[in-house]
């Protein structure tokens, strides 16, 4: 199981195929996504990589947090996240993961925070039908109606769909196809929409419900901290060794 990456949502556009068809895509940008630390079974009870992305000032950063970046010998990061990996998929600390960590045509799962909508009624939030337009209904056309029973059960059950705050939820969209890659600018173009607003942080992983392409680099495609580039072999070649 390979590591994912931390990216920022740039926005949506479209790309054209050779036959003239257009594909709506979301542009994701890797902002110096580096490995900060390893999580091992012996020390932590599980295996994972801690990644960081984006730039952050150290003026108001806690001293303990500054120390973590100092140990990893990397610049302070705006966004930090962990990705579970297998033992053979660990990437050296300080390495920067490149956009060609993924390959064109493979499927990925993306996770982000949905756009906030504020307080919303039942019709907008849960797609309720509302009450009738006439025949005795006054003022309450967009209300949700009854919220429970009568004396029995005598309460409104938990998780009842009602008006309330909408959006700002952690959303994962499965099986988005990688359409294009721009390694020099660190761009990943995936087909379809991605949750979140422009500039929002997005986690991109190999799709859980789709097979990993044979030409996908394993443990990944990254640039070492000393400036050297690690040309990882495709998974199929490593299995044949």
From Swiss-Prot:
GO biological process terms, semicolon-separated: translation
Record's GO cellular component terms: cytosolic large ribosomal subunit
Cysteine disulfide partners in this protein: none
Pfam families per record: Ribosomal_L3
Chain residue ranges for the region called Disordered: 139-164, 215-241
NCBIfam families xrefs: L3_bact
Modification(s) after translation: Methylated by PrmB.
Species in which this protein is naturally found: Rhodopseudomonas palustris (strain HaA2)
Subunit comment: Part of the 50S ribosomal subunit. Forms a cluster with proteins L14 and L19.
Sequence positions bearing N5-methylglutamine: 151
Compositionally biased region (Low complexity): 225-241
Biological classification of the source: Bacteria, Pseudomonadati, Pseudomonadota, Alphaproteobacteria, Hyphomicrobiales
InterPro entries linked to this entry: Ribosomal_uL3 (IPR000597), Ribosomal_uL3_bac/org-type (IPR019927), Ribosomal_uL3_CS (IPR019926), Transl_B-barrel_sf (IPR009000)
Keyword Phosphoprotein carried by entry: no
Protein name: Large ribosomal subunit protein uL3
Keyword list, A-Z: Methylation, Ribonucleoprotein, Ribosomal protein, RNA-binding, rRNA-binding
Keyword rRNA-binding annotated: yes
Record-level Gene Ontology MF annotations: rRNA binding; structural constituent of ribosome
Cross-referenced PANTHER family: 50S RIBOSOMAL PROTEIN L3, LARGE RIBOSOMAL SUBUNIT PROTEIN UL3C
Family note: Belongs to the universal ribosomal protein uL3 family.
Function (record text): One of the primary rRNA binding proteins, it binds directly near the 3'-end of the 23S rRNA, where it nucleates assembly of the 50S subunit.
Domain of life from the UniProt record: Bacteria
